[in-house]
Regions:
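Short loop/turn motifs enriched for small/polar and acidic residues
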Residues: 11
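Domain-terminus/edge residues, biased toward the C-terminal soluble/receptor-binding domains
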Residues: 3, 7, 15-175
Length: 175
């Protein structure tokens, strides 16, 4: 993942000697996690019962209140220790753009949510994703020697996009 300033001693995130990370490294972890739909399925759930079909169901509420109160927020991880304060790595998708935010050492959960909301609002108000080349766009047709077909189309594996400020003209990029 390229984590350069992280050393996890335990899986709980609780304070331990030589246990640390940075906002940037936490964003790299989040960037990998959001690639997995099952993760977002869990982290976007505000409340649910665990062990529903047993004699002792357990009601669980997501400590990331933004999942319930800010449309589009679908994760990701809250945390608190005396040393780290209130932390939140959040993610939200809107208009074909996903943003990841990280706040650390916040005073309380309200400040944690408010600062995260400010960052998300800023990002979505200022920036947009521009598709330069659609995955269905033929770049070139190539002749196939001794193939079952005479030609094949060269297309991008996935959409090719760039991040643009909304206030700027969309870039006209040719290939």
């Amino acid at each position: 993942l390229g984590l350069k300033n992280t050393n996890f001693i335990n899986a709980t995130g609780l304070t331990a000697d030589n246990h640390y990370s940075t906002a940037y490294d936490m964003s790299l972890i989040a960037k990998e996690l959001v690639k997995h739909e099952k993760i977002l399925e869990f982290t976007s759930t505000y409340e649910d019962y665990l062990r529903k079909d047993t004699k002792s169901p357990f009601w669980l509420v997501n400590t990331n209140r933004l999942v319930r109160f800010k449309e589009g927020v679908d994760g990701l991880k809250t945390g608190f220790t005396d040393e780290a304060g209130y932390c939140l790595t959040a993610t939200m998708k809107k208009d074909n753009m996903r943003l990841i935010t990280v706040v650390m050492k916040e005073e309380n959960t309200s400040k944690r949510s408010a600062d995260t909301t400010k960052m998300l609002d800023y990002g979505f108000n200022i920036y947009m994703v521009q598709t330069i080349l659609d995955e269905k766009t033929t770049i070139e047709k190539k002749k196939v020697e001794l193939g079952k077909t005479l030609t094949t189309e060269i297309v991008p594996k996935e959409n090719i996009t760039i991040l643009n400020k909304k206030s700027e003209e969309q870039k006209n990029i040719t290939y």
